């Protein structure tokens, strides 16, 4: 049964549960407990109190002079003068964060003072036993004894899931290092994680285990994407689907090498898109635009937005076929920022590239992972976004950078957890205020970025946020086409096969792009870009004059289009382009009258046109057409 309309209605509810930081969530509402639940709550509360007492005894001694200098320096950040910038035509004031040069300069001094403190507490920062104690405290604090008891009171299975988690120090540390469970719902996270482990032996070790845990921690609502399917069942389906895609070589080569603490694996599954849409967009990229799967990582996969989802206002989708999903409809006529961001996101998700929404005031955009760091796409820099995954955008970026150093990142967490046990305030305004230890944790993150020389790689396609025209000149790469892909052949029945690369000058231009097919052959894409039509010219030797049925083997993602053939200069023939939904399909035969010997056939599209990919043309003697 088709579920796209139902699923669309729950997108917003899904997004509201996606925060990953254990320190950014509000305290959940109290759950009504049974008598057994109240006993469990008392048990968890005592466990939390004992851990808190143990942690407060672990506080290392800090040189008071160094502590005072650090406190003084980061306190001065509140006095930095803000700057005003024009972002997408609107004035935006920036005070806190690297977007303000004065703030960034002052924060260098704060980091220097923080390093002096960190040098004195190195022994504390590397303690494994202390780390396990603090991680368990952080988990109980984030989950709350009441919510843990509310889950455990449901039955023996739920109680066993909680016991498994709370008795496994290694799992607790891993869980909290990767950001904890969304919304503090550790019971649901364990239910999903256990289901994935039961469904796949490989999910017990290596990056497969990290990925299984990360996905379970991220999506902790009762359902995931499909509103009538329990979350654990849905996540198992996604995991097995992606596992098969990984085995089949469909996922990106970097998928198993994302590394770091594993935090980025939280974002490889889509936040709201069905498996049907995921599989369809894989087909689009692999069949229709395989060149987009080989680009450098800023534009890899999401380039499909730039090539095939034009920025168009006022699109009426009411008359579009009801059996198409929203994603499929966006390809028909384009759309404004939201549809473009949605297509960009799912194009990354489908191939295992961590992706997120990156909204800014009045604009929808996206952000995704690259081997060099996260970048915003088709929108402004992180500075100017409203939130990323429920976190302040610059804190999300810093988190993603610091997670690249698992050892250093755990030290940052130890400082935070100690401060939490001591009742300190959380850092605010990008490290401008907060308690001593928790702020030190923030600056330990910054030290990682500086020590590892991690760069902010900035925006991608910001100039295309609300435009189809880039101010940056695009370099058109030429491809070498082996002769075997240019050879015209004649079958025993007289059918002539003309590879699309057998044209007179197989050269890439604004509209025409020759590329390697996913199966190792060659294909051409005739795209949206360019002001004037471009031609493909073919010379074909016909052994016997007569009428031939012409077909083209095509792949399309739009409908109601034609292309034009010009035969031997005189004859013009329209050919209907089928809507193939990203499959490969032959056009309906059209009759061409050809002479014996050399014939010239020109191919072009009417303007304005939509994209079409072609592998070959065929000419079949009319008597053989069925």
Task: Name these PLM-found stretches.
Residues 29-210:
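Non-catalytic protein-protein interaction scaffold segments in large eukaryotic complex-forming proteins
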């Amino acid at each position: 049964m088709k579920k796209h309309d139902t699923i669309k209605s729950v997108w917003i509810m899904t997004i509201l549960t996606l925060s990953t930081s254990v320190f950014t969530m509000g305290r959940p509402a109290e759950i009504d407990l049974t008598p057994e639940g109240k006993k469990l709550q008392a048990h968890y509360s005592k466990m939390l109190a004992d851990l808190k007492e143990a942690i407060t005894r672990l506080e290392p001694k800090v040189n008071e002079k160094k502590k005072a200098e650090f406190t003084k320096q980061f306190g001065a950040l509140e006095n930095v003068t803000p700057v005003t910038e024009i972002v997408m035509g609107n004035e935006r004031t920036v005070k806190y964060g690297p977007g303000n040069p004065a703030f960034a300069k002052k924060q260098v001094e704060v980091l220097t003072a923080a390093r002096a403190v960190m040098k004195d507490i190195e022994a504390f920062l590397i303690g494994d036993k202390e780390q396990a104690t603090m991680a368990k405290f952080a988990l109980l604090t984030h989950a709350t004894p009441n919510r843990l008891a509310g889950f455990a009171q449901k039955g023996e299975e739920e109680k066993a899931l909680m016991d498994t988690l709370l008795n496994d120090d290694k799992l607790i540390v891993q869980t909290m290092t990767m950001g904890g469970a969304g919304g503090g719902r550790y019971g649901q996270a364990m239910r999903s994680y256990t289901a994935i482990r039961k469904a796949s032996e490989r999910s017990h070790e290596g990056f497969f285990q990290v990925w299984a845990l990360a996905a379970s921690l991220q999506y902790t609502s009762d359902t995931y994407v499909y509103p009538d399917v329990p979350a654990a069942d849905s996540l198992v389906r996604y995991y097995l689907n992606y596992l098969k895609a990984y085995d089949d070589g469909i996922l990106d080569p970097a998928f198993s090498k994302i590394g770091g603490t594993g935090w980025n694996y939280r974002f490889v599954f889509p936040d709201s898109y069905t498996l049907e849409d995921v599989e369809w967009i894989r087909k689009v990229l692999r069949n229709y635009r395989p060149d987009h799967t080989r680009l450098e990582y800023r534009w890899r996969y999401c380039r499909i937005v730039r090539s095939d989802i034009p920025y168009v206002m006022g699109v009426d989708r009411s008359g579009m076929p009801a059996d198409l999903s929203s994603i499929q409809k966006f390809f028909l006529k384009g759309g404004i920022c939201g549809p473009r961001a949605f297509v960009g996101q799912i194009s990354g998700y489908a191939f295992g590239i961590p992706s997120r929404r990156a909204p800014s005031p009045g604009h929808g955009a996206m952000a995704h992972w690259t081997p060099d760091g996260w970048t915003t796409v088709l929108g402004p820099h992180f500075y100017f976004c409203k939130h990323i995954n429920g976190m302040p955008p610059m804190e999300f970026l810093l988190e993603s950078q610091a997670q690249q150093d698992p050892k250093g990142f755990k030290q940052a967490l130890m400082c935070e957890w100690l401060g939490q046990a001591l009742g300190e305030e959380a850092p605010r305004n990008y490290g401008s205020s907060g308690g001593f230890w928790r702020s030190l944790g923030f600056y330990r993150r910054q030290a990682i970025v500086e020590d590892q020389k991690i760069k902010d790689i900035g925006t991608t396609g910001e100039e295309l946020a609300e435009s189809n025209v880039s101010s940056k000149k695009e370099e058109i790469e030429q491809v070498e086409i082996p002769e075997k892909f240019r050879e015209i052949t004649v079958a025993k029945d007289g059918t002539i096969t003309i590879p699309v690369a057998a044209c007179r000058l197989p050269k890439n231009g604004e509209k025409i792009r020759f590329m390697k097919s996913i199966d190792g052959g060659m294909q051409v894409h005739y795209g949206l870009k360019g002001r004037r039509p471009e031609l493909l010219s073919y010379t074909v030797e016909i052994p016997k004059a007569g009428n031939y049925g012409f077909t083209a083997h095509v792949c399309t993602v739009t409908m109601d289009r034609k292309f034009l053939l010009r035969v031997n200069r005189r004859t013009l023939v329209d050919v209907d382009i089928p809507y193939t939904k990203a499959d490969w399909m032959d056009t309906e035969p059209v009759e061409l009258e050809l002479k014996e010997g050399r014939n010239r056939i020109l191919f072009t599209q009417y303007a304005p046109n939509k994209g079409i990919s072609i592998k070959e043309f065929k000419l079949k003697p009319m008597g053989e057409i069925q």
